[in-house]
């Protein structure tokens, strides 16, 4: 846990806890959040220590339907995962290299070319973890651009005197302490060395290092992963509420009304969680959470639920329908494995007025989606309307 709190500087310049990178690594490479009972921090730490073992483990997810990649790297056509080593021949040549130039140059790549590009990114990401090049945990003293470097880059970045000695020795000492700790079950030395690295980061990287509160918030955000769980909670509440609302239309009972109101409250609580998750992303990233495809989808889902709760006075069907649509929108984000990574804001989007403009435009899709599902529900109710229940149907 302490190792996961250390800060790294990613390729885009964002400062984030190692815990965030390790979560992204597993999610992007293997479409999973853990491996064989190991959490993401343990997997990443193990990779940096035992790279020769991990290159043999089938971890890289290969999309189904593209057998050409499986054929090129030499794995079974039914295999879902490939080991890192399979992407290279005996001479160390990258097997996908002949196909990537055309894929990256294509103005409108086909699905096969997209799969090549996606797989290449997974291989590169895993290579950065295995080699330790992503482990940029050392801030360069007095660097005007606030550059942080990895252990591999330590000799070319102006570390002098005791700082140079420290950067050269601290990671080997830490890995040695981990090995000793695995035998003795005493991790005190390893924890002390992590605190030492943490102190080095605070001393030379304080200007760009996130506050302890932000680190806590980001690790909690990664741990609970509320947005990934919300679609299942939303759809469960929506379906039950929908059933009880329909039954209550035909058989008015006090317990049915109480049950419907209870699910209404549950949906409201889920919306509160949804809102808190968006606020957390805003706080962690430092900018409004609608700056990429994933955030836009999550925000559209939020606006759908917001308008559903705002117009719930006359009919509880509005709330149930809104929760159902919200669940479908959120599921779309995760079913397509859209990257949920928190990233730095692109300079072109760094505008107060543009932020408001995008918020209004994107939120407008919520009422459109809500109107669609309510129209469908209204048609269903009209279909079942007769002279006996016409009055009740009109009220709903």
Regions found by a protein language model. Give the residues of each.
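Generic detector of multi-pass transmembrane helix bundles and their immediately adjacent loops
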Residues: 303-396
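Soluble extramembrane regions of membrane proteins in the secretory/endomembrane system
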Residues: 1-220
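Conserved hydrophobic/aromatic pocket- or pore-lining residues that grip, position, or stack substrates
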Residues: 197, 292, 357
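Short, glycine- and charge-enriched coil/turn segments that flank and shape catalytic ligand pockets
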Residues: 184-186, 250-256, 385-395
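Residue-level marker of motif borders
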Residues: 7-8, 287, 352
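Core alpha-helical transmembrane segments of integral membrane proteins
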Residues: 210-336, 340-343
């Amino acid at each position: 846990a302490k190792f996961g709190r250390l800060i790294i500087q990613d390729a885009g310049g964002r400062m984030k806890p190692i815990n965030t990178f390790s979560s992204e690594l597993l999610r992007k490479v293997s479409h999973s959040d853990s491996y064989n009972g190991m959490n993401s921090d343990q997997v990443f730490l193990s990779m940096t220590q035992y790279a020769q073992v991990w290159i043999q483990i089938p971890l890289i997810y290969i999309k189904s339907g593209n057998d050409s990649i499986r054929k090129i790297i030499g794995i079974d056509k039914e295999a879902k995962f490939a080991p890192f080593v399979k992407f290279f021949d005996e001479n160390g040549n990258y097997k996908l290299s002949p196909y990537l130039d055309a894929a990256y140059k294509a103005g409108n790549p086909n699905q096969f070319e997209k799969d090549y590009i996606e797989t290449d990114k997974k291989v590169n990401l895993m290579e950065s973890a295995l080699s330790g090049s992503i482990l940029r945990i050392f801030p360069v003293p007095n660097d005007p651009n606030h550059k942080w470097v990895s252990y591999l880059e330590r000799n070319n970045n102006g570390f002098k005197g005791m700082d140079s000695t420290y950067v050269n020795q601290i990671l080997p000492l830490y890995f040695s302490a981990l090995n000793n700790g695995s035998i003795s079950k005493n991790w005190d030395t390893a924890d002390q060395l992590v605190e030492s690295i943490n102190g080095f980061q605070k001393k030379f990287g304080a200007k760009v290092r996130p506050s302890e509160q932000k680190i806590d918030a980001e690790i909690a955000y990664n741990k609970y992963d509320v947005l990934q769980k919300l679609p299942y909670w939303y759809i469960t509440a929506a379906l039950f509420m929908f059933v009880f609302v329909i039954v209550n239309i035909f058989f008015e009972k006090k317990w049915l009304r109480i049950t419907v109101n209870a699910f209404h409250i549950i949906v409201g609580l889920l919306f509160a969680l949804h809102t808190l998750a968006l606020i957390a992303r805003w706080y962690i990233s430092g900018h409004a959470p609608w700056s990429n495809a994933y955030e836009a989808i999550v925000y559209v889902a939020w606006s759908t639920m917001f308008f559903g709760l705002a117009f719930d006075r006359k009919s509880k069907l509005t709330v149930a329908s809104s929760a159902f649509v919200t669940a479908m929108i959120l599921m779309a984000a995760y079913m397509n494995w859209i990257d949920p990574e928190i990233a730095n804001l692109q300079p072109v989007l760094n505008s107060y007025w543009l932020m408001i403009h995008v918020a209004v435009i994107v939120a407008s899709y919520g009422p459109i989606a809500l109107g669609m599902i309510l129209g469908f529900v209204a048609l269903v109710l009209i279909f079942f309307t007769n002279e006996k229940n016409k009055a009740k149907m009109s009220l709903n």
